[in-house]
Structures are given as C-alpha cells and as structure tokens.
C-alpha cells in the first residue's frame, strides 16, 4: 500500500512538470555571447554572413553594436519584457541595440537606448515598422537583421536634406515678403503720422506731446527745410524792397526777417545736437525735437506776419494810377457835400441848444481842411507815379496813404453832421431807460456787497469802483445840456456795471453748484464709511486687517474733506470722493473675508459659526492662527507624477516590438 502511494506521488510530480514546464524550444532571457545568436536555426550560411557583415559595418562606421538573437519563443513573456531582461542580463550599454525574434511565436522586439547619440525616435520607429517587421513577415530573418543594422547606420537621407532646404527656402521667402510688407506699411504709417502731425499747431507744446516720436522727427526735418527756403526767399525780396521803398518803410519787414533768422538758427543748433554721435533718451529726443519745431514755427510766423503788409505795399505802387483816380473821385464827391452840410449845421443850431451841438460845431471847417490836405497829397503822388524813379517809391506810398487818411476823416466829419439830429433825438428818448437801468444796476451792486463776506477783496473791489462810476455818471447827466455826450457816457458805465454783475452772478452760480456737489460727495462718503464700519463691527471675528486699514484711511480722508469744506471746496470734494472709493474697497474686502470664514466653518460643521464670525466667541478663532484657525492649512502633495519628464514606459529605450 505504501508502495502504491509512493508511485502515485511520483506520477503526480511528473505530470505537473509536464504541464507547468516551459514549452519545447522555449528560451528564457540569457546573456548574449555573440553578436548573432541563432538558437532557432533560421539563418542559412549566407544569411548569417550577411547579418555579420552588416553588424560589423555598423560598428566600424558608427561604433554601435547590434545584437541579433533568434529563439523559437520568449518562454511565455512579452517580446519587450524578454528583450529588456536580456539586455540587462547581457549588460548592454548606450551603444548597444538589440533585435530579438521569436520565430515560432512570431514576435519580435527592437530596442535602442534613448541615450544613443545620432539616433532619433522617428528613425528607430521607421526602421522597425517599415523595414524589420515586413522582412520578418515575409520570413526573411537575415534581411530583418540587415535592415536593422543598415537603419542604425543610415545618415540623414537626401530627401530629408531636400525637405530641410525647401523648408528653409520657404521660411526665407516668407520672411522677405513680410519684411517688404512691413516696410511698406511702415512707410505708409509714417506718411499718415506726418500728415496728422502737420495739422497740429506747431507752437503748441501740449499738442506736440501727443505726436509719435518718429513723426515728430520727420516733421522737424521737413519744417527746417521749408522755413530755411522761406527765409532765403524773403531775404532776397527784402533787399529789393529796401532799394525800392527805403529802409524806413521796410523796417517792419527787416525786423521780421531778422527774427525769423534768429529762430531758424536756434532750430538748426538743436537739430545738430540731435544728429551728432551722442545718443539721447527718448524723452530728451522728444524735448529737443519739440524745440526745433517750435523755433521753426516761430520763424515761419514772423515771416507770415508781414507777408500781407508787404504784398499790399507792392500792390499800392503797382496800382498807383488807378488808386489815385479813385481818391480823386472821393475828393470831388466830398467837396460837393461841404455846402449842404454847412446848411444842415445851421438848421441844427436853430433846433437844439448850442451845448448839444458842441461835438459837431466845427466839423465842416475841419472837413474842409482835410480835403485840402488830401488834394495836395494826391497831386504829389501823381507826380511821383509819373516819374517812376527807383528809390522814390516810399514817397509815393506816404502820399497815397496820407490822402486816404485825410479823405476818410473828412467823410466821418460830414457824416456826423448829417446824423446829428437823429442821434440827438435818439439820445434824448433813450436817456430815461438808460438811467433806470443804471439805477437798477447800482441797487443790485449794493445788495451783492451787503451779502459778500469779504467786500474789500477779489471782484467786490471792482464792483465798488463800477458802482461809484455809474453814480457819478448819473449825477453829471442830470440837467446836462449835451444829451448825446451824456447818453454816450451813461451807456459805457452801464455796460461796465452790467458786465461785472453778470460775472459775479456766474461766479456765485458756480460756487453754489460746487457747494451742492460737495454736500452730495460728503453725504455719499459718510454713508459708505458708516455702513462699512457697522458691517465690520458686527462681523469683527472674521474680518482681517486689509479691510480695516482701508476703512481707517477712508475716515481720515473724510475728516480732511470736512476740514477743507469752507476754505477749498474743490479739494474737499476730492477728499470726499477718495473716502467713498476707499470705503467701497473696504466693503469688498470685508465681504470676501466673511465669505471665506463662512466656507471654512461650513466645512467644520460647528453650531457656533455665527457667534465666532461676529467675534462673540473667540476661542476657536484664535486656536489655529489668524487664518489657519478657520479650517487649518491644507498641505500640498509631494513627489512628481507618474509621467514625470525623463521617465518612459520602456525604461529609457527607443523602438518597440510586436507580432509579425
């Protein structure tokens, strides 16, 4: 019986060995002793020779060792696992690649160390998928090994170089096109900016500050050239004008040209400073460019200020005959008015008191004298115009202008007599209304002075002077014999008083609006500060220092606003607005603190959250620090992720494996 049991145990062990043992031909990972190992017997003599030659050539060319091993199967392991274990067992390094092939199991693995120099992942995958695997699939075992060796021994292909060259060429073309487009856009942008800069007042420094720096530089260069050309032209024309009209008549033009030259010289000096080898900061360059433009603009305006007068002077000489004919016609027309105007003056003396006629009593006599003076100058001007002697044109100009002035005065004297009756009647009829208006103005002035807190300062002093002048004018107008003169004086003082009262009324309205704005600003600031203060007071247990700091500053600003309420309302409004802004910020910070605290206590789940937030219970609040007590600190995890840089599922190898 014992013998039977012993025999059964032996049979069981043998059966287990048959069932659990490796299949026939199985080859576990082992240490490789040769570059080409054919344990599956699939290589022919010529095939082994070809593989050996390819392996040797790879080592000779690139010092890379390729190990090739053929087995029937991988003893139940995956191809990658078997190959990796064989690599470790064989102590292969960074210059050792392995091609393992299971002929019966139709599996393979091609592993190349990722640290192997001169080999890319794409290159290895391309060799494995498109050269090794197809050869194995077709049963060409030696061809697969040769393909592996040649693939590792391959330098960058010509197609890759072509692709690289084409890519570089395309990039160069694109960059060139971009440069051309950008240059065109820059030129167009600079032209637009320069056109906009030309529309800016060149003497306005504030307006020039908004002009781009490049446009400012372009504008300065353009203006310097333009103004220099204008100065040169004006200098030449001035020399001819002095010869023609003399130095006295052309003195204003000479002064304008000299001023323009001085301003232009200053512009050139600054422009030289900009163009030297000493670099300037953008701010310094802007300041210098602005000085160039302003100086050039002043030079240009000096010339422009006299251009019109200079042209009129030349036109007067050129058109002297026609102009003298016109003056002669005016002389004749005014001379014919002397008799009728004298008759009209006599009639006025019978209608009005002599005192009312004082301002026009001698008008006819004076007009006759002016006409005689004009006649003499017209005759002298004709003689000079007929002679046309160079250098005597100044006398012609003086004679023409003297005649024009005399005729104008004679016309005004005669017109005054003709309109005297109408003017005197209008003055007499309008005097009561003007007097009433002045009396009303004086009354308003007295009321304003009574209400003013400081009657001897500011515009109130001007108002006192205007009121007193109006009162004196009223006193003189009472019983005046010359109503026209009285009316003229009263209208002037009335206009002055009304203008000053209107200005004071506008200033008072402005002050009233400012005070209303101040009251509104103070009300808003006080309301916000009070609301935030009450909010923090009822939730003091959860609000940190930031909100409290903003509130304290808001209170300080509000106090400053009250201090300046009377002396400087504008500053008081600014302080009140600042207090409102700070209070609003404090409210926002306080809300955030309360919400954070509520979330923390919600996570902890206590029943005293409201009391703690309100500062009634402070034990829990202080138990963990200012912020940590509201839930504690949450530590972060340490260590990298499973896919940290530098790690890979194949243990630092390129390539892979699979079935064929």
UniProtKB/Swiss-Prot annotation:
Disruption phenotype: Not essential for growth. Belongs to the UPF0603 family. The chain crosses the membrane at residues 162-182, 605-625. Residues 488-567 form a coiled coil. Keywords: Cell membrane, Coiled coil, Membrane, Signal, Transmembrane, Transmembrane helix. The lineage of its organism: Bacteria, Bacillati, Actinomycetota, Actinomycetes, Mycobacteriales. The keyword Transmembrane applies. Residues 1-26 form the signal peptide. Its main location: membrane. The keyword Transferase does not apply. May play a role in septum formation. InterPro entries: TPM_dom. Residues 638-660 are annotated as: Disordered. It is a multi-pass membrane protein. It comes from the Bacteria. GO terms for cellular component: peptidoglycan-based cell wall; plasma membrane. Induction: Induced by albendazole and thiabendazole, which inhibit the GTPase activity of FtsZ and probably septum formation. This is UPF0603 protein Rv2345. It is found in: Cell membrane. It comes from Mycobacterium tuberculosis (strain ATCC 25618 / H37Rv). Pfam families: TPM_phosphatase.
């Amino acid at each position: 019986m014992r013998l039977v049991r012993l025999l059964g145990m032996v049979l069981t062990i043998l059966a287990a060995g048959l069932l659990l043992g490796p299949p026939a031909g199985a080859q576990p990972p082992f240490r490789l002793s040769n570059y080409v190992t054919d344990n599956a017997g699939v290589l022919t003599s010529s095939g082994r020779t070809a593989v050996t030659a390819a392996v040797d050539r790879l080592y000779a060319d690139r010092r890379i060792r390729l190990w090739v091993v053929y087995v029937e199967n991988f003893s139940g392991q995956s191809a990658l696992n078997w190959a990796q274990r064989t690599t470790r067992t064989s102590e292969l390094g960074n210059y050792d690649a392995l091609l393992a092939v299971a002929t019966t199991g139709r599996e393979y693995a091609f592993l190349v160390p990722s640290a192997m120099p001169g080999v890319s992942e794409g290159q290895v995958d391309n060799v494995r998928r498109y050269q090794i695997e197809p050869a194995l699939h077709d049963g060409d075992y030696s061809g697969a090994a040769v393909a592996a060796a040649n693939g590792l021994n391959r330098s960058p292909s010509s197609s890759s170089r072509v692709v690289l060259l084409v890519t570089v060429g395309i990039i160069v073309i694109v960059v060139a096109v971009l440069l051309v487009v950008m240059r065109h856009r820059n030129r167009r942008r600079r032209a637009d900016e320069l056109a906009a800069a030309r529309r800016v007042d060149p003497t306005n420094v504030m307006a020039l500050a908004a002009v781009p720096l490049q446009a400012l530089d372009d504008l300065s260069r353009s203006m310097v050239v333009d103004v220099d050309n204008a100065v040169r032209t004006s200098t030449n024309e001035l020399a001819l004008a002095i010869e023609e009209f003399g130095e006295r008549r052309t003195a204003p033009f000479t002064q304008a040209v000299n001023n323009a030259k001085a301003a232009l010289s200053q512009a050139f000096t600054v422009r030289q400073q900009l163009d030297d080898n000493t670099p300037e900061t953008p701010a310094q360059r802007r300041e210098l460019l602005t000085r160039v433009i302003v100086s050039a603009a002043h030079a240009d305006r000096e010339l422009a200020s006299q251009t019109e007068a200079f042209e009129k002077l030349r036109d007067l000489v050129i058109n002297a005959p026609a102009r003298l004919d016109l003056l002669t016609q005016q002389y004749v027309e005014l001379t014919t008015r002397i008799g009728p105007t004298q008759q009209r003056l006599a009639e006025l003396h019978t209608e009005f008191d002599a005192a009312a006629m004082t301002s026009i009593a001698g008008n006819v006599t004076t007009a006759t004298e002016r006409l005689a003076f004009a006649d003499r100058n017209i005759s002298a001007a004709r003689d000079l115009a007929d002679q046309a002697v160079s250098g005597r044109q100044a006398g012609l100009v003086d004679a023409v202008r003297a005649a024009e002035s005399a005729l104008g005065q004679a016309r005004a004297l005669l017109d005054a007599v003709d309109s005297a009756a109408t003017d005197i009647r209008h003055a007499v009829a309008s005097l009561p209304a003007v007097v009433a208006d002045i009396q009303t103005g004086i009354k308003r002035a007295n009321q304003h002075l009574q209400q003013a807190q400081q009657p001897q300062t500011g515009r109130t002093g001007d108002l006192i002077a205007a009121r007193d002048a109006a009162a004196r004018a009223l006193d003189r107008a009472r019983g005046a014999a010359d109503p026209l003169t009285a009316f003229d004086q009263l209208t002037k003082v009335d206009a002055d008083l009304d203008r000053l009262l209107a200005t004071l009324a506008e200033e008072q309205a402005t002050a009233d609006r400012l005070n209303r704005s101040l009251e509104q600003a103070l009300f808003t600031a006080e309301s916000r500060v009070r609301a935030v203060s009450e909010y923090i007071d009822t939730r003091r247990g959860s609000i940190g220092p930031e909100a409290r700091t903003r509130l304290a500053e808001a209170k300080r600003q509000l106090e400053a606003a009250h201090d300046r309420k009377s002396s400087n309302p504008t500053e008081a409004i600014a302080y009140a607005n600042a207090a409102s802004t700070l209070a609003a910020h404090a409210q926002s910070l306080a809300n955030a603190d309360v919400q954070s605290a509520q979330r923390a206590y919600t996570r902890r789940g206590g029943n005293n959250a409201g009391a703690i937030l309100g500062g009634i219970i402070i034990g829990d609040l202080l138990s963990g620090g200012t912020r940590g007590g509201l839930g504690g600190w949450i530590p972060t995890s340490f260590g990298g992720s499973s896919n940290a840089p530098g790690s890979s599922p194949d243990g630092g190898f390129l390539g892979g494996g699979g079935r064929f």
